């Protein structure tokens, strides 16, 4: 499943809305049927106008004359503008990590032992558009794994090489679990499979280490910080599955498998990062 960012799409499937769609919204169907109101940019309301120069828009951000929604659309506009640069940087960093990163090389070797192969052909960098819903949620991701296609890295969401290393490690744990246990990755039959691989991926990838939580997400908690991070990110990822009803359902499923999956560090002897 996708490496979640702070806001991930919910997996509920409410009844179809019957009201007329407003001009600044478009309905998007995701996760097996959920209907979300995705906001398009309205320069008169947001202050962001793609027809003006980058520096004019940047000045609006500095002076507070661009709304939070406008800043979201401005950022997405820059991602589109800089797509070629971001893809080139992502591919260079990916290749470097496959040559020199201990965790990436180790996971690649373990996947090979199970008959799989990960390389530039099935670990691909792409621009992944985020979307802003009418209720203010940002739907985005840093990467994703598909048993049929391999690993997707969202080049525009990757901050630096260390972030890419964590993202690759997360998705490679999913690939390992798929090859070793043939897990029900998307949770079509059993959400507990999805919950277990998400717990393991967040635990083993390094994305929940204290320094990233503190300096990256502003969470300075010391007691139980690691466990809380792994649990919350697993819940977010399970929540995004189509068969998950709501956050309460996701929490229940994660709790059901927590003890066995949180203690399972395979293929590592212990938590590496």
UniProtKB/Swiss-Prot annotation:
The keyword Hydrolase applies. Residues 1-33 are annotated as: Disordered. Keywords: Hydrolase, Membrane, Metal-binding, Metalloprotease, Mitochondrion, Mitochondrion inner membrane, Protease. The active site is at 171. It comes from the Eukaryota. It is an enzyme of class 3 (hydrolase). Residues 1-11 have a biased composition (Polar residues). InterPro entries: Peptidase_M76_ATP23. GO terms for molecular function: metal ion binding; metalloendopeptidase activity. It is a peripheral membrane protein. Its EC number is 3.4.24.-. A divalent metal cation binds at residues 170, 174. Its main location: mitochondrion. Residues 17-27 have a biased composition (Basic and acidic residues). The keyword Nucleus does not apply. GO terms for biological process: mitochondrial protein processing; mitochondrial proton-transporting ATP synthase complex assembly. One of its GO terms (cellular component) is mitochondrial inner membrane. It is found in: Mitochondrion inner membrane. Has a dual role in the assembly of mitochondrial ATPase. Acts as a protease that removes N-terminal residues of mitochondrial ATPase CF(0) subunit 6 at the intermembrane space side. Also involved in the correct assembly of the membrane-embedded ATPase CF(0) particle, probably mediating association of subunit 6 with the subunit 9 ring. PANTHER family: MITOCHONDRIAL INNER MEMBRANE PROTEASE, MITOCHONDRIAL INNER MEMBRANE PROTEASE ATP23 HOMOLOG. Belongs to the peptidase M76 family. This is Mitochondrial inner membrane protease ATP23. It comes from Pyricularia oryzae (strain 70-15 / ATCC MYA-4617 / FGSC 8958). The gene is ATP23.
